[in-house]
């Protein structure tokens, strides 16, 4: 991602305030959900863990049916992964131009624009959100000794996250946003027969969202809940198949987003914004002292993580060789807010493990669809935005296709397609028979994407307010950067992570 003047301000404010942060932090092949890609041994398998697990954290936060792996005693795991993303964004100035130079026509400003050329709002920057520590803690306990034939698992870890930091750029207006979802999981797994296991778990997330843009946003937190059901069946001595389902997870961030800097009816005087689109209507306004044209309005923002369904297979090729395959479907199109930017996503991952004495050599690969919609429409969950532009003027604007497209570009870390991972497991670590070590290192290969040209066919018949604001470049485009003259933004992302964990088995 990058920084920009007004441009960024507008798009980013929308993004940060609204979106659980925005691009750059803990993102990967599952959008910004983690799905065991940072956890214990599963991180070595690119997250592959639906049918078989090699560590307690992956059982607690993955398919709860795999908790039955830990019948017999107590297992405690403690570790961390350090994630290092790199996100850069180049923008031609379209968004900043739209916020600064269209007052009275498409946006509301109390001051006359300085008339800066559209291209003067361009930027090319690298996010400073470049290192994250992800904790992994879990314990499993066999309750058979109490006459209860189940395994209980509890744990704490980050379940999703994303973020950007462009405060170092003078054109960013202090743009920075961060979302961290810290999950507390509790689950039980039970053997139903010699071949079938079932499990159920509950996730309670403490979500923290900070939107650090001038005039728009702050830090808000919320609690969310998600349930997971899982089953696995051993179809032969060597092969196990498994299935799990996760519900949606909802968070509501109270008074997070600024909808207007100019009261409840900020667009009544705009010459290029029609009554049919809300020119004379009132914006959402959580405020106690406002009039139709003065005062700052805010709104609550409701965001849903998608429901997921996953299928996994594990197979022991011989006594020392294990291979695994996972397929996960993420229903972004049913998720409030994110359905405006994402389509459904499919993720495939494979893992292999070779045991050599007390050593376990591991490798994994993951591939994911790019979930970003090729065309976005005007904002629905967030219909308007209020901010302070790069010239210091309070601005209010409808969420045009241009701003939605710009915000989508801020989420670019979700376009990762390829993850490659390796790892090492050591049983009886340091000669201690009840202690094991899991380590991993992984990269997400560089991807880039251009934004703007996909909006070319977004006409008034599809809901666009005007040809000017539908989302194509207004400041020359990025044809010289491998995009087209209709693209306003190009984003490039890559990442690396490594980590380790110790497990005590009693």
Predicted regions and their residues:
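Solvent-exposed, charged interface segments at domain starts and junctions
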Residues: 2-4, 8, 58-61, 178
């Amino acid at each position: 991602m990058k920084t920009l003047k007004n441009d960024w301000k507008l798009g980013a404010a929308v993004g940060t305030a609204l979106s659980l942060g925005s691009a750059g932090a803990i993102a990967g092949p599952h959008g910004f959900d983690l799905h065991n890609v940072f956890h214990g041994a599963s991180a070595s398998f690119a997250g592959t863990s639906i049918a078989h697990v090699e560590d307690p954290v992956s059982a607690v936060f993955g398919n709860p049916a795999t908790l039955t792996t830990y019948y017999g005693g107590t297992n405690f795991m403690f570790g961390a992964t350090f994630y290092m993303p790199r996100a850069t964004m180049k923008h031609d100035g379209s968004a900043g131009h739209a916020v600064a130079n269209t007052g009275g026509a498409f946006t509301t400003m109390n001051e006359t624009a300085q008339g800066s050329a559209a291209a003067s709002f361009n930027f090319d920057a690298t996010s400073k959100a470049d290192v994250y520590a992800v904790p992994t803690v879990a314990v499993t306990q066999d309750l058979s000794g109490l006459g209860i034939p189940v395994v209980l698992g509890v744990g704490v870890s980050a379940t999703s996250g994303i973020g950007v930091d462009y405060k170092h750029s003078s054109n960013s207006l202090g743009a920075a946003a961060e979302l961290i979802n810290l999950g507390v999981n509790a689950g039980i797994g039970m053997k139903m027969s010699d071949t079938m296991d079932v499990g159920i778990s509950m996730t309670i997330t403490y979500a923290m969202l900070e939107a650090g843009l001038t005039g728009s946003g702050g830090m808000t937190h919320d609690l969310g809940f998600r349930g997971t059901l899982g089953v696995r069946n051993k179809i032969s001595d060597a092969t196990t198949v498994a299935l799990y389902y996760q519900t949606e997870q909802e968070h509501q961030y109270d008074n997070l987003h600024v909808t207007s800097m100019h009261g409840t009816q900020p667009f009544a005087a705009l010459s290029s914004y029609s009554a049919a689109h809300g020119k004379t209507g009132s914006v959402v306004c959580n405020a106690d002292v406002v009039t139709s044209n003065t005062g700052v309005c805010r709104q609550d923002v409701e965001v849903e993580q998608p429901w997921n369904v996953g299928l996994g297979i594990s197979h022991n090729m011989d006594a020392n060789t294990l291979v695994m395959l996972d397929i996960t479907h993420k229903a972004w199109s049913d998720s409030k807010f994110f359905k405006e930017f994402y389509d459904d996503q499919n993720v495939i991952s494979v893992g292999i493990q070779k045991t050599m004495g007390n050593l376990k050599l591991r490798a994994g690969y993951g591939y994911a669809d790019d979930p970003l919609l090729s065309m976005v429409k005007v904002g629905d969950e967030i219909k308007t935005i209020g901010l302070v532009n790069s010239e210091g003027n309070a601005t209010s604007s409808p969420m045009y296709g241009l701003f939605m497209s710009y915000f989508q570009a801020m989420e670019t870390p979700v376009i990762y397609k390829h993850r490659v991972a390796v790892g090492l497991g050591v049983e009886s670590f340091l000669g201690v028979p009840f202690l094991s070590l899991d380590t991993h290192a992984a990269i997400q290969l560089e991807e880039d994407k251009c934004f703007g040209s996909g909006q070319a066919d977004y006409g008034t018949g599809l809901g666009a307010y005007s040809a000017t604001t539908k989302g194509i470049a207004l400041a020359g485009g990025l044809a010289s950067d491998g995009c087209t003259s209709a693209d306003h933004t190009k984003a490039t992302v890559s990442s690396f992570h490594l980590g380790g964990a110790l497990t005590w088995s009693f």
